[in-house]
Amino acid sequence: EELLENRRRQNAKNRIPDLKDDAFDISRMEIMGCPVLKLIHKKRTEQADLFLIGGGMISAPRPGSIKKALQFARETGLDVYVPYYPLCTGYPLTRAYEMIHATYRSMLFEYKAENISVLGTSSGGNLALGMVPYINDNHDDTPMPGYIMAISPGTCVATDAEWQRMQELDKKDVAIPAQYMKTAAEIMRHGDDSVPEYMIWLQKGDFTNCPKTTFIYGSDETLYACAPSFEAAMQKYGVDYEMIVGEGMFHCYPVFPVCKEAKEGWDLMIRLMKKEHGIKS
């Protein structure tokens, strides 16, 4: 509770930055009472990305992350939607899933499903991947997006093997303590025992009809412990996927290009996204 109260105070101080770029129409809309930032190219494009910024389900997107979203939009040529989804400081995780689904549905009025990608970092990676089991969970009137990229997707530990791997990686990880992934389940439930299992242990989700998916992990992060379980899930459901691992790299390294290898991760992320949207580099 002390952790959550600390995050509530930090989130209360957080502000949506005032972005300016002559190539974009930048605006906001509201979905379920939450702001969604729209970064729309003035030169019309039919390609878009739903950009889900992580924060352990308890921290709102920081101004620096929003500026990275604009850089991503600029470098990929995609229109980008950034939802400030409900956090588990105040709601169970079901609320975030519902709001993100509603945001995606709103995008379908402007873009074809196959022209929409979903990129998520950390807990945002969980939410990006989680759109698939959510659609399969009685929302099958919604078409799947065209492509998913999950960077260091967060999920809770489901097996002893995952926990053993995570404890080993904990010795190297500078960002996500293994112990947090033990306590995260209660944070995500927020007192609601009806939160579906797949929202907490995403590796158990139903990935039927999942679009092509790219995973990107750093080899030295605790969340990499769950990569084999995600691979097994992808194989079980016949998903076209790729697993990219940055050797010696840290949590969400492509979006924190603080060294040469991490900068290469950012460039790779941009190249892959453009390729999947059929945009020439």
What does each model-identified segment do?
Residues 1-6, 47, 113, 130-281:
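Alpha/beta hydrolase fold serine-hydrolase catalytic domain that processes acyl esters and thioesters
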Residues 1-44, 194, 281:
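A glycine/proline-hinged amphipathic helix-loop "lid/cap" segment
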Residues 46-55:
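Short beta-strand element of the alpha/beta-hydrolase
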Residues 56, 85-89, 155, 250:
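Alpha/beta-hydrolase active-site loop signature
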Residues 61-63, 92-93, 161, 226:
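Conserved catalytic-core motifs of eukaryotic protein kinase domains, centered on the activation segment
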Residues 62, 68-69, 81-115, 259-262:
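Catalytic nucleophile-loop/oxyanion-hole region of alpha/beta-hydrolase
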Residues 120, 124, 128:
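Gly/Ala-rich beta-loop-alpha elbow adjacent to hydrolase catalytic centers
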